[in-house]
């Protein structure tokens, strides 16, 4: 097999932009599809930064998203798999297609897994993950953990059953969680619960799989302009919590970066000639007291 791997990226999604932000480098330029501006979630940012440099297999949510990724990132529509990885049938279909493509191309397969940020069947107050403990919809936690943890374990098990790992000398599995996995913040209990669950699970998976030359990397990004902060309530609460910590931020100055930064971190892990266990990355200005 050649050294240039096939990269499977799960959880990729584009969201119509409802709010436009600026970064420390100026106004953020959003992707455009049929006249509409779109924001990338973490996985979509990985797609954008790797497209054209690697063969990609993108696992998203809706069939219609294939056309968006094709036009904005150059991903062929036959390399987009709409799937709900909480469903056993979709896991099997995804793993089967990935294994077949791995053998067709004759290259190693690496996995980039993203479990999403707020995928839950439970109704969230204000449609936001941000909530004080007294107002938190705790029944959302099982859904959030399922999307971040169960999907990863089931996918890895299915890929193993299809012989993916046995056909290559080593494998890189990169899971994108969040800085919230290790840095708690007021009113962010739901996000902390799902990402911290993923963080702990990944540490255990790494102990299990490293002896088999399956190397596990966790990437923990900070506040990202994915559409999460387009919700007015979420933005207002985030600013209030930030002010309680002594930082005078507004919607115009709230520290955010784009998902391209996450994609660049993934690119480094893919190319690094070593086992990269963890990467934490924050936008400039996000909670300097946590800078250490």
Predicted feature descriptions by range:
Residues 150, 218, 237-292:
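C-terminal helical subdomain
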Residues 99-100, 116, 143-169, 207:
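Amphipathic alpha-helical dimer-interface segment in Rossmann-like NAD(P)H-dependent oxidoreductases
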Residues 73-89:
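Rossmann-fold cofactor-recognition segment
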Residues 10, 106-124, 148, 175, ...:
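Rossmann-fold scaffold of SDR-type NAD(P)-dependent oxidoreductases
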Residues 2-56:
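Canonical Rossmann dinucleotide-binding motif of NAD(H)/NADP(H)-dependent dehydrogenases/reductases
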Residues 109-112, 127-153, 198:
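Catalytic Tyr-X3-Lys loop
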Residues 15-18, 132-137, 165-197, 202-203, ...:
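Catalytic loop of short-chain dehydrogenase/reductase
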Residues 199, 209-226, 274-280:
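Conserved Rossmann-fold SDR core element
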